[in-house]
Amino acid sequence: MVIKAQSPAGFAEEYIIESIWNNRFPPGTILPAERELSELIGVTRTTLREVLQRLARDGWLTIQHGKPTKVNNFWETSGLNILETLARLDHDSVPQLIDNLLAVRTNIATIFVRTAIRNHPEKAQEILAQAQTVDDNAESFTALDYGIFRGLAFASGNPIYGLILNGLKGLYTRVGRYYFSNPEARKLALTFYSRLSTLCDEKAYDQVLDCLRAYGKESGAIWHSMQGTMPSDLAEARR
């Protein structure tokens, strides 16, 4: 395995995660004893202990006092925070993972965007107005797009939607930087934000669903046209 982490803790974390992913430490099995594992990885037991606690919080492991550390089935025990890790571990699956990410965003947005526009129209308009001053580059549009969806999620009155968007931020941002490098993607997004603003003004709440689905379909078509030239390091973390 190729591990790029620079710190001992980062190295140990990547080593264990990749070992779980590659079934060196299969789900359901017991992790090697602390002394053995620290020697195997080449880190101190103190560093290893900190890493194991962090991996347990992320759902990779189960640690119980007086019992061996168990490897979890991370699909069942982890949260959205491991999306970037999964994308980095399996480059071949990145397009499908991103398709799933975008589908989730569209599906939940049909609920929270409509609710935000209906129940808190002034706040929704304030959020959408950010699109009027955005710089025409990928970085700015990525921040804008995430900010609008996240802002409307919280404006819906149900903070759980906002927390879901928080969990998607890492991979969402990496994808956005590439997707919004396409001028057509930026143009489509501005049209979408403007349309939402109009629907908010007109109190046309029943049209929000169709607007979101149309945007999901059109932005998905642009995204699929870009997959052939997608950089191999799209999911790599900045270390």
UniProtKB/Swiss-Prot annotation:
HTH gntR-type domain location: 6-74
Key words of the record: Activator, Cytoplasm, DNA-binding, Fatty acid metabolism, Lipid metabolism, Repressor, Transcription, Transcription regulation
Main location as per UniProt: cytoplasm
Record-linked SMART domains: HTH_GNTR (SM00345)
Annotated DNA-binding residue span(s): 34-53
GO terms, biological process: fatty acid metabolic process; regulation of fatty acid metabolic process
Any one GO MF annotation of this record: DNA-binding transcription factor activity
Compartment(s): Cytoplasm
The keyword Metal-binding is annotated on this UniProt entry: no
SUPFAM superfamilies: GntR ligand-binding domain-like, Winged helix' DNA-binding domain
Keyword Membrane: no
Any one Pfam family match given in the protein's UniProt record, by short name: FadR_C
Gene Ontology cellular-component annotations: cytoplasm
Its biological purpose: Multifunctional regulator of fatty acid metabolism.
Complexes and interactors: Homodimer.
Protein name: Fatty acid metabolism regulator protein
Organism encoding this protein: Yersinia enterocolitica serotype O:8 / biotype 1B (strain NCTC 13174 / 8081)
